[in-house]
Amino acid sequence: GSSIYNIVFIVFASSMPQPKFAVGIANFIVLIPTFFTVFVGMQADKTRQKARWLIHLGYLQAFLFILVALLTKSASYLAFATVCFLNIFSDIISDYRSGLQMPILQKNVEEKDLMEAYSFTQLLTFLGNFAGQALGVWLLSISQQNFAMVALSNALCFLLSSSTLYLVRQKLTHDTPAATEQKLPFRKQMKDLYQNVQMIFEQEKIENFLLVLLQVLLLNAPAGSIMGLYNLYLLDHPFWGLNLSQSLLVIESCTVIGIISASAFSNDY
């Protein structure tokens, strides 16, 4: 559910008046939820009834995409702006739900199997994202650019997902977070997070933590901006006579293949 509409959202933006402007806005909209990732993760850790929120928020996302389906029938910028807001809200909810899942996984998987379980979860996430985007492009093609139908399909996926979780809700157990008497300031929480990450690096005997962190940030910055440039470039220069959505799927396919291939090697270079 969280991936079917990713490419379709860019294609919807390209159908607006002044498509390059709309696609540029869409590129920025996709990035906004990443600014809240740390805060959302902290809130997920503090949530006491994780299974309940995991299920209920899935139903909320289904409702959001029903609204998106209604809005995409209009080509106005007011409708586009509302879809952008709903997309941001849904992506933040998806990040929050991912944070809720981790403690449940930790509780129900033996410690010796946790790393293997994390790796398998990551693999399924990448494959699910790729399959979801491919499904979105296929639905868009057979429906002749019917954005509402794709959004409704997305809503159906969230509905089925939460309904499945509801059926096994008794098994979604986790350790209850310790209640804190005094709420820590956000700045203090960020400082503690930084110190914890630094401690992990030191345990792994990785020297010069700040330099490694800077390298990661510098590598991620251009890598994260490449897709936005492709979105604009492919408006006028699609690959091999394909349309925009199919060309974007080719790029995503190469990215997923690269990530999975890199994950197969555990050596550092």
Indicate where each model-derived feature is located:
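Helix-to-coil boundary motifs at intracellular loop junctions of multi-pass secondary transporters
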Residues: F12-M16, K46-T47, I104-N108, I142, ...
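Transmembrane alpha-helix termini and helix-breaking/packing motifs in multi-pass membrane transporters
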Residues: I10-M16, A69-S74, N129-S153, D236-H237
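Juxtamembrane intracellular "pre-TM" segments in multi-pass secondary transporters
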Residues: K171-L213
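A single, central transmembrane helix in multi-pass transporters
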Residues: I7-V8, F147-M149, Q198-S263
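Small-residue hotspots at the loop-to-helix junctions and early N-terminal turns
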Residues: P17-N27, S119, L242-E252
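C-terminal ends and interior cores of transmembrane alpha-helices
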Residues: Y59-Y77
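Helix-loop junctions on the cytosolic side of multi-pass membrane transporters
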Residues: A151, A155-Q182
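Substrate-agnostic recognition of the 12-TM MFS/MFS-like secondary transporter fold
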Residues: G1-N6, N27-A44, A51-Q61, T82-S141, ...
